[in-house]
Amino acid sequence: MANRRKIALIGAGNIGGELAALIARKELGDVVLFDIPQKTDFAKGKALDLEQNGAVLGYDASIKGTSSWADCAGADVLIVTAGIPRKPGQSRDDLVATNLPIIRSVADGAKEHCPNALVIVISNPIDAMVYEFKRRTGFPRERVLGMAGVLDSARFQLFLAREANVSVKDVRAMVLGGHGDDMVPIPSACTINGVRATELISKEKLDALIARTRKGGGEIVQLMGTSAYYAPASSAVAMAESYLLDQKRLLPVAAYLDGEYGYKDIFMGVPVILGGKGIEKIVELPLTAEEKEMLAKSAKSVQGITDVVKASS
């Protein structure tokens, strides 16, 4: 009898709980909901609630709350949400000093117990945290990625659909660059059922949608007092599903660049083919001069925060 897949979720907070619920409903595998020892009972309680939910919704996934890395051993996918979420007035980069020790601890546990897992980092600032995770573990770049572009593109996709008054299902959007205020929505790559979005939406309105996309996470923080969790969880699950089922979806993720787009030794949002081997190909899009300029600005921001991480190691 084949072994069931195991997905380990590091952090049992808002995103961790929603991740567990989505993974269980999709029957992608059994779930380990991991948190620090002080929150062991919280993780166990959330796991029990989710398992009981399975009796209502009809899924059979095992969901275990724990603070022991031994329970994560051999995980097929590791999704890292551990860290302090943003509060109103904070940027993602403000979290680096707080979350860096946390990501290092997680990296050490993963290296020992989950050496063959695909790793998806959600903890902010994503581009810096995923860089440190890869640096500390030495995992191959094909199996270490940050969740950013899927979420940012989804936000852009929604705003485009609302502006054009069309179904969000017909909109395809792409956001590259760092997961911050300098992210790069790519108008030339946006289509509405094959029609360029630029033909249906004026440049003035498109620029306003781009600005809102860049501040999309901050808008939610201001409204809720904490970071988003439904859409981020769905974005990470889409990535995990493409890997586990070898779907080979083209998704924008924070990937380690080694010359692609002209950048080296940084993680930044780019389109990739994500399949059973992890990142199987980085897709280099033809960009307009304006888009290249915006990407360079974003890369400079990412490099700055990455240099802070390098200096502290």
Swiss-Prot record:
Disulfide bonds: none annotated. It is an enzyme of class 1 (oxidoreductase). GO terms for biological process: lactate metabolic process; tricarboxylic acid cycle. Its EC number is 1.1.1.37. The active site is at H179. Coiled coil: none annotated. Keywords: NAD, Oxidoreductase, Tricarboxylic acid cycle. The keyword Signal does not apply. It catalyses: (S)-malate + NAD(+) = oxaloacetate + NADH + H(+). NAD(+) binds at G11, A12, G13, N14, I15, G16, D35, N99, I122, S123, N124. SUPFAM superfamilies: LDH C-terminal domain-like (SSF56327), NAD(P)-binding Rossmann-fold domains (SSF51735). InterPro entries: L-lactate/malate_DH, Lactate/malate_DH_C, Lactate/malate_DH_N, Lactate_DH/Glyco_Ohase_4_C, Malate_DH_type3, NAD(P)-bd_dom_sf. Pfam families: Ldh_1_C, Ldh_1_N. The keyword ATP-binding does not apply. Catalyzes the reversible oxidation of malate to oxaloacetate. Belongs to the LDH/MDH superfamily. MDH type 3 family. This is Malate dehydrogenase.
